[in-house]
């Protein structure tokens, strides 16, 4: 990439001049289903900026800068690049992010969307709108990111499917219709109509990233080009001419400039969605305007480990101007750090810049403690609310155990794993303090495969990886009786019951409409109006676990010294819900209610070592008396298959406890939507391929948690307990507390 660095340094003065004018900045990125051609499309854009030679664009995969990405021909991380482009006689700076399409890497997409105002959605003309297209469009719309459409691989319609010009036109209209249906379904109400793509207005482009051409309807009309001319170009061998006349980079960058809003426009509607502070305050106004002279506020979207520079935080400057040497405060971590260097990105290369104003994407060295999702501010603003937490669509549901072949390498391995989890918060790391066992959880098997590959590359150590295990959740199916938890010294008594948390409240936690640090009155009002909560109970919430969707409520009145032990009770609640009594799996959807308490007057007799076990034991007893069960993760499958093979595919799904949710048929293709337990998914790929003689496309992504069928529940609990070295029989409430 050295040529890229030279080009950029030549342009650096021009880039900094534009960076000060928000009207000439666009923050956009590619979004797509896996293999629909995002990275090849991004490479065309690099060619346009003079960063790749035209010969290699389309197959260089320059944005896939991790070696395994080029090896597997797929993107697993999100890469940033700043492009300089002239349009209508004006220079523009387009900050561009290439994101992964595979379902296992949606976490990288979530983080990238925070810095984008527009998403270039790439759709394969043959496969059309797929599950992951739906997921990324939905994620984009939740972050108020405007989507525009590029229908890629038109060459496949001509060369593989041999469609006539009329059929190609029909295929494109179908994709536009399906795409607009997603916008209708997921867009914020005020943008449902405004953001639907209108091909006649140039909001949709079509072309071939591989052959480097792209065209919009207005461009085609102006040049007098018809679908029959495009078919001719392929049949008569003058595709290169098409690429010269309508270079893809020019078409796409023009579409982005015309239809993706500049930051000072986008922030007017994005900030009220992303930030809960006072919009009429000085900082509120600066954020809405993307004011480079306002106080500094940066949203961190990702953190990467650099072998020489340490941790590099990348984010978007929403207000103010960040300079080398500035002091910055990390909200939530309550610490000040000094920015040692500021950069912009060119694929894997970082280019040092003296400053970066509002509306731009910047990389910072020196803020080692910052994490994806953090808010960095001018130290004088340490009291302002941070940006909304990022909402990850997929959860880590597959786990592997990692063991170094040489025990002396353990510390180095653990250190490198901690760095991986910082870079990718959708990974989950657990180290058993007693046994030293290392457990790494990810969204899917591919996610873990890539993580362990990176681990090997970075540490150069040998280690073994166990076969994948599924992560489960524990929950309850009814309300328990009240149970008494006694502290070990018998001087404190706490009384709890548990019950299932209703789905509406779980959704309010998931969408962050209610949060732990929210004003209790505001939270109580939302719970009363949207989930039918009792007013007193809603005001009594002490803690919300937004990772596994549990909460604890205080329903006591007038208990002496309760306030002094509140934090210890909350810690005991978190301890209990992290690993439940059935099989030490995390609890999900649990409402814990404290009804009464007797607290010792002497602080020496009511410390954490007394209160936490009393809380945990009472919660465990309550859970075991409330018809506990195991929840298993289900995957959603989108299948496209030749109609002749529907029967064979259905029988494969039935064999694996799969359930068909929906089926539609067109002349060439049947479309099936199904659900399948992750537990049953490991061999399904080969079986589906064999059943349909290879004539099948499908994609899988996390769907939901569902109770395990009663017929296999007892066996599964025994298996899980055995694997964890626990006694096989399920404990009784009286194993944790005295009968009450």
Swiss-Prot record:
Alphabetical list of Gene3D superfamilies matching this protein: 3.30.230.10, 3.30.70.240, Elongation Factor G (Translational Gtpase), domain 3 (3.30.70.870), P-loop containing nucleotide triphosphate hydrolases (3.40.50.300), Translation factors (2.40.30.10)
Pfam family for this entry, one: EFG_III
Diphthamide: residues carrying this PTM: 605
Entry's localization field: Cytoplasm
UniProt xrefs under InterPro entries: EFG_II, EFG_III/V, EFG_V-like, EFTu-like_2, P-loop_NTPase, Ribosomal_Su5_D2-typ_SF, Ribsml_uS5_D2-typ_fold_subgr, Small_GTP-bd
Positions of the tr-type G domain: 23-264
Molecular function per GO: GTP binding; GTPase activity; translation elongation factor activity
Residues that bind GTP: 32-39, 98-102, 152-155
Annotated keywords: Cytoplasm, Elongation factor, GTP-binding, Nucleotide-binding, Protein biosynthesis
A GO cellular-component term linked to this record: ribonucleoprotein complex
Family listed: Belongs to the TRAFAC class translation factor GTPase superfamily. Classic translation factor GTPase family. EF-G/EF-2 subfamily.
Known function: Catalyzes the GTP-dependent ribosomal translocation step during translation elongation. During this step, the ribosome changes from the pre-translocational (PRE) to the post-translocational (POST) state as the newly formed A-site-bound peptidyl-tRNA and P-site-bound deacylated tRNA move to the P and E sites, respectively. Catalyzes the coordinated movement of the two tRNA molecules, the mRNA and conformational changes in the ribosome.
The protein, known as: Elongation factor 2
């Amino acid at each position: 990439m050295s040529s890229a660095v030279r080009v950029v340094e030549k342009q650096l003065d021009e880039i900094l001049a534009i960076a000060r004018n928000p009207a000439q900045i666009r923050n956009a990125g590619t979004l797509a289903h896996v293999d629909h051609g995002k990275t090849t499309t991004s490479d065309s854009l690099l060619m346009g900026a003079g960063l790749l030679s035209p010969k290699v664009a389309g197959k260089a995969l320059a944005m896939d800068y991790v070696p395994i990405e080029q090896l597997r021909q797929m993107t697993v991380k999100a890469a940033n690049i700043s492009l300089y482009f002239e349009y209508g006689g004006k220079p523009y700076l387009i900050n561009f992010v290439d994101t992964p399409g595979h379902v296992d890497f949606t976490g990288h997409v979530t983080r990238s969307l925070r810095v984008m105002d527009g998403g270039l959605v790439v759709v394969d003309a043959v496969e059309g709108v797929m599950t992951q297209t739906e997921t990324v469009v939905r994620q984009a719309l939740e972050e108020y990111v405007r989507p525009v459409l590029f229908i890629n691989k038109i060459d496949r319609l001509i060369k593989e499917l041999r469609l006539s010009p009329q059929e190609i036109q029909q295929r494109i209209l179908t994709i536009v219709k399906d795409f607009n249906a997603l916008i209708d379904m997921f867009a914020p109400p005020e943008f449902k109509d405004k953001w639907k793509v209108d091909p006649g207005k140039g909001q949709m482009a079509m072309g071939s990233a591989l052959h480097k051409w792209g065209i919009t309807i207005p461009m085609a009309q102006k040049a007098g080009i018809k679908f029959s001319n495009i078919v001719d170009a392929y049949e008569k061998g003058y595709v290169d001419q098409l690429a010269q006349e309508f270079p893809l980079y020019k078409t796409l960058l023009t579409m982005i400039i015309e239809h993706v809003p500049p930051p000072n426009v986008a922030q007017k509607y994005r900030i009220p969605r992303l930030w809960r502070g006072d919009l009429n305050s000085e900082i509120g106004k600066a954020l809405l305007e993307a004011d480079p002279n306002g106080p500094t506020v940066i949203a961190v979207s990702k953190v990467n480990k650099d072998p020489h520079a340490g941790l590099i935080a990348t984010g978007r400057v929403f207000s103010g101007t960040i300079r080398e040497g500035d002091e910055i405060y990390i909200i939530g971590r309550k610490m000040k750090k000094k920015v040692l260097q500021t950069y912009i990105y060119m694929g894997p290369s970082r280019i040092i810049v003296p400053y970066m104003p509002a509306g731009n994407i910047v990389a910072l060295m020196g803020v080692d403690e910052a994490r994806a999702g953090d808010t960095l501010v001018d130290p004088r603003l340490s009291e302002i609310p941070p940006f909304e937490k990022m909402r990850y669509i997929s959860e880590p549901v597959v786990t592997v155990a990692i063991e170094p072949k040489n025990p002396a390498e353990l510390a180095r391995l653990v250190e490198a794993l901690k760095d991986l989890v910082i870079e990718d918060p959708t990974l989950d790391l657990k180290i058993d303090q007693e046994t030293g066992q290392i457990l790494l959880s990810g969204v899917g098997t591919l996610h873990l495969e890539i993580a362990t590959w990176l681990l090997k590359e970075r540490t150069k150590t040998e280690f073994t990886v166990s076969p994948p295990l599924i992560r489960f959740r524990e929950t309850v199916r009814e309300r328990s009786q009240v149970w008494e938890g006694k502290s070990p010294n018998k001087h404190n008594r706490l009384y709890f019951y548990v019950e299932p948390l209703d789905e509406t409240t779980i959704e309010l936690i998931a969408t962050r409409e209610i949060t732990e640090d929210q004003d209790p009155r505001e939270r109580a009002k939302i719970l009363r109006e949207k989930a039918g909560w009792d007013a007193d109970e809603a005001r009594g919430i002490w803690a919300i676990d937004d990772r596994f969707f549990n909460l604890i409520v205080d329903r006591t009145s007038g208990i002496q010294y309760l306030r002094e032990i509140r934090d210890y009770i909350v810690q005991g609640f978190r301890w209990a819900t992290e690993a439940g009594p059935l099989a030490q799996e995390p609890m999900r959807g649990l409402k814990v209610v404290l009804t009464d308490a007797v607290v010792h007057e002497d602080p020496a007799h009511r410390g954490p070592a007394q209160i936490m076990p009393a809380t945990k034991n009472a919660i465990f007893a309550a859970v075991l008396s409330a018809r506990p069960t195991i929840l298993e993760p289900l995957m959603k499958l989108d299948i496209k298959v030749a109609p002749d093979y529907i029967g064979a595919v259905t029988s494969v799904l039935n064999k694996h406890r799969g359930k068909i949710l929906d089926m539609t048929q067109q002349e060439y293709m049947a479309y099936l939507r199904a659900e399948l337990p992750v537990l049953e998914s490991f061999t399904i790929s080969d079986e589906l391929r064999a059943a349909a003689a290879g004539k099948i496309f499908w994609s899988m992504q996390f769907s939901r948690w569902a109770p395990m069928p009663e017929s296999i529940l007892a066996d599964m609990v025994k298996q899980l307990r055995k694997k964890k070295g626990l006694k096989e029989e399920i404990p009784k409430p009286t194993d944790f507390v005295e009968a009450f």
